Amino acid sequence: MNKYITVKGARVHNLKNVDVTLPRDQMIVMTGLSGSGKSSLAFDTIYAEGQRRYVESLSSYARQFLGQMDKPDIDSIEGLSPAISIDQKTTSKNPRSTVGTVTEIHDYLRLLYARAGTPHCPKCGRVIQQQTIDQIVDQVMTLPERTKILILAPVVRGRKGEYTKLLEDMARRGYVRARIDGAIYELSDLPALNKNQKHTIEIVIDRLIVREDIHTRLTDSLETAMKLGEGLAVVSEVDGADTLYSQSYACPDCGVSIEEMAPRMFSFNNPYGACPVCSGLGVLMKIDPANILPDPTKSLNEGALRVTGWDSAEDGNGMARMYLDALSKKYGFSLDTPVGELPKEIIDILLYGTKNEKITVEYERDGRMGRFQSPFEGIVTNLERRYRETSSDAMKEVYESYMTNTPCPECGGRRLKKEALAVTVDGKNIAEVSEMSVRDAVRFFENIHLTEKERLIARLILKEVNSRLGFLRDVGLDYLTLSRSACTLSGGEAQRIRLATQIGSSLVGVLYILDEPSIGLHQHDNQKLLNTLRHLRDLGNTLIVVEHDEETMLASDYIVDVGPGAGVDGGHIVAAGTPAEIMANPASLTGAYLSGRRRVPMPDFRRSPSGWLTVRGARANNLRNITVKFPLGVVTCVTGLSGSGKSSLVNEILYKSLSRTLNRSKERPAAHDGIDGVEQLDKIIAIDQSPIGRTPRSNPATYTGLFDLIRDVFASTADAKTRGYKSNRFSFNVKGGRCEACSGDGIIRIEMHFLPDVYVPCDVCKGHRYNRETLEVRYKGKNIYEVLDMTCEEALEFFGALPRLAQKLQTMVDVGLGYVKLGQPSTQLSGGEAQRVKLATELSRRATGRTLYVLDEPTTGLHMADVEKLNEVIQRLADAGNSLVIIEHNLDVIKTADYVIDMGPEGGDRGGAVVAEGTPEEVAKVENSYTGQFLKDILAREGARPKR
């Protein structure tokens, strides 16, 4: 077998005809500056070709259901294995996905509870046994005399199919009627069933009227129904309720039956297990009164109602005003009273209506007064009705902005029916086990108490559960609970879960390509991740890891350094070899940092706070009712192990609460008592790595406001004035100046059914996006398309004489984006590049000194040299008097902070407290702070810094 993966002539994105040879069955790290081309080589070339070759081996029918990748622009790749990509962009957004379902642990738990669980009565809690026919007959006979009943045998329950043969067989066996999806049909005259829909089919065994003499006939009918329904029978009261009886399990005291103990009974994604109220989601979306009346200090006349249509009440006109006047007259309250001082009964009437009580509404039309009487629906009731009735996604989004998720009152957020929650294994139901952290679940299953029979049944199931839990623990995720929703996981957590799942599959001879698996992982847990990667390699797999973490690079077998610069300045292999060879290579920037020849510089001093923000009583998720002080006017790093409570404190409480107060957002902060010191700020801005736009029409020029200035420059030329062109003529988003053949995209998509869609340059504008007349207008010899095709560095030189343009372009260069083209589609920017575009936009604004910036792991995707540039930007924002709160694990950022708040001591239920706070020098002295111990080593090497 080939010992190497050989890539020849790779030209994807900015790769410059690259040749590279990679050793198989090794752990290879690809590194380089953000935008240097490492992801283009790893994901868009090697993975894309491996995946494409596999998909091409399938039939054309199968291919249309799989996302087929474009053939990368390469001469050849040899030695490829089947490729599996584990990146961070595929985090599930499905609210039904949990850590348990993603890792398949929940599937094994369902099987365990179905086969070895002990059922209890959901009403009285006693252990229940199988029900006899005599017990069922006795219960039916307690119905009122003369009650008409049907005895039904359920033969199909909530399954897809046509069931033609089954129904024909029932007719041959002498049965006359069936109830299909709730309606009774003659078996001789059945409707055609849709095979793609789920159906419930019950055969009518007998029709009876309850009286003393039906005892024998009822027994015979129930026995027949039980035989046909495989232990289940339905007694349906005509014009009444259905009761399901089971020969399996029923409570002799309460008469409550539990259906068959099947795995689907424990699935919240199946109607037979899901809570009927929340459909298995565990939460209900309800209109939150706090979103309707966000400011209790305002009166109704001052616009206290922040609902579309009602916020115009202060204008003195319109329907809203008429209803508010009528309500104030009817119930005797003033529209000038702050809503926080109005009686609860009045607030209830405003929100939920007058029920059937009518109010007199007066109106004016054509100068004449009129009146009508009508009940008032209530604002919340009205919004809920409109939400149910609308088919518009846009309107649904508007109504959902007033809603918040509240735990389901029926299941208490546990997602399952009460019957499923009444089944236990070793005294715990499936929800209680799912709510355990991985750490506690490992302990529970290692010491589980089962009978000899149950242990025999559960042996193989427990083996699978224990191994999967062990893999989650080994990748540093022992603080997660199995019930944790997958959409709340960070990119790094989701990636490590998929990594643990892959180890569980024990595949051999596979090429794994990973995207920064160390993201979100504290240095303390790094060794666990590295052991996992080594284990995957030792199984006989090849690992290509796109990574910037120093420890991961030093632990690898082979490093490929891509560069030397980013964008057009990158795309070459600068160095390739073992970590020792890279460190000795003078051409490798990565080698310079690894060897210590170059370091991210420390500041000369630590700034002193200009004020404080105090978060009181923070108790969201695992936070332990803590009070935390954030300094203002400085750079603060919030650190701690994964799951220690950093995001809960900063994103869920600090950011959402201040955003609601300062930005008037509808964000609902997590549980806390309050925040003191907000008056010292005028705005809060979150700078994350989400895309700056979702379509190719968005680019750095449009996001930063450069495009508006550039269009103004072109509109001010003599040629444009002669032609009567305004600045909108130079926009590719509106009709007029753009090419209408491609609507200003420059490319046209051609749909290929069994092949990937093909994008070809527009043959009218030749990919230039504008029509001929617009492109004839030039500034300093360049047209608008040629300007958008410039890099920021080229544009800075070109527009250097125009101060406003030059200032914005200079900040783009300062944050390390000089190589990015002005018109580069936002969809082609990496997360790190998108974040720096946002930082450049903020830097170019006039500083107020009263802004709080929140950054969540800004070093994601950044090389050590990029981190150095990022640090310079962060320090500039702080020098302008602004405050920064940064969630970070990267020690090169933490060591340059003015203040550190270290959360912990561990993750999950062992976290949620402040372990240490102060300058990096002060935190380094705290012995039980993991972050402090790492800082201690750095400060010993690079020297402590004084306070200013």
Describe each region flagged by the PLM.
Residues 1-948:
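Conserved phosphate-binding elements of NTP-dependent enzyme cores
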